[in-house]
Amino acid sequence: MIASCRKLLPVPQGQRGLRQSEAVFTHVHQLPGLIEELSAYLTDCEIVAVCASRRPRDEEASYMPVFQAGDAQGRSLAALLRVPCFATTHQRGHVEAAKVDSGVAAGDLLAVHLSGGTTEVLSLVDDRLTLLGGTLDLHAGQVVDRTGVALGLPFPAGPHLEELAVRGTARALLPVAMADGGLYCHLSGAETQVQRWIAQGMMPKEDIAREVYDLLARTVSRMVTAASQQTGIRQVLIAGGVASSRLFRELVTQRTAKRQPDLRVRFGRPEYSGDNAVGVALIGARKWREQQALKEIEYGSTDTGR
């Protein structure tokens, strides 16, 4: 990697995120500065391609306005540089980034995407992502952020809530709510109970935080073991912002080892688990190399025919 530039979207204290219109405006406002910062590292580099996330997932109907900001910037840069602009999805970017230094073996795998906007278990077979399960209401990251904000922590609350959780004790007070043979889950009931604990003020903040991470680990462990039993796939790659938590990694690994010892659970680097452009860049590089290989074959066959 030559350079990596990031800037969190500013969220006012007490709020649990941004509306789409606010997020689009903030992306449009912040992207030029990030590109200027990035350009300082590229003085001796030749840019051969650009890649951008065009939509959240692989499905054609998948759409969020905020992705138009990055896609527009990418296409504009590519046009000015006269290089190809490749498109991918936010979810594929997460999975690709999580592969870096994860130790995941080549072949089929189960991919788990856990964030504030996604809680899904998918199979990745022959480069095809297929949805197997997920949440039926709240996302894992929403539970973390709503708990943290209610406790007076900044948004995004993950790192701050984890600091509390490592000092707390869990007694599995939040029941796991599963559906469809364990492939799908409900998290809204647990979040309601957490808000009740916070309002009552009778339970230590550290224990509340620990109960949240314990619940998420138990839930994800059940989902991946159910997916493994359905598909026969024995390796799992967990990506997304929630997966950057060291505590969550330890808990879900321990839980899964007890439930299904032959299931290998892998994570990427913590810094590549949350939102980042590393996976998107790797996808763009691969697509460019594939394009170049096709050109060589085409030119080679043309020369042979002469």
Residue ranges and their predicted role:
Residues 163-236, 242-257, 285-291:
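A contiguous, well-structured pocket-lining segment that forms one wall/lid of small-molecule binding clefts
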Residues 34-35, 44-46, 55-85:
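Phosphate- and other anionic-substrate recognition elements at nucleic-acid/protein interfaces
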Residues 236, 253-280:
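Conserved phosphate-binding/catalytic loops in two-lobed NTP-binding clefts
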Residues 1-52, 56-59:
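N-terminal beta-alpha supersecondary unit
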Residues 83-110, 283:
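Conserved phosphate-binding catalytic cores of ATP/NTP-utilizing and phosphoryl-transfer enzymes
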Residues 44-55, 231-242, 266:
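Short glycine-rich phosphate-binding loop at a beta-alpha junction
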Residues 1, 106-107, 112-115, 120-203, ...:
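A short helix-loop
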Residues 94-97, 268-306:
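Glycine-rich phosphate-binding/hydrolytic loop that grips phosphoryl groups
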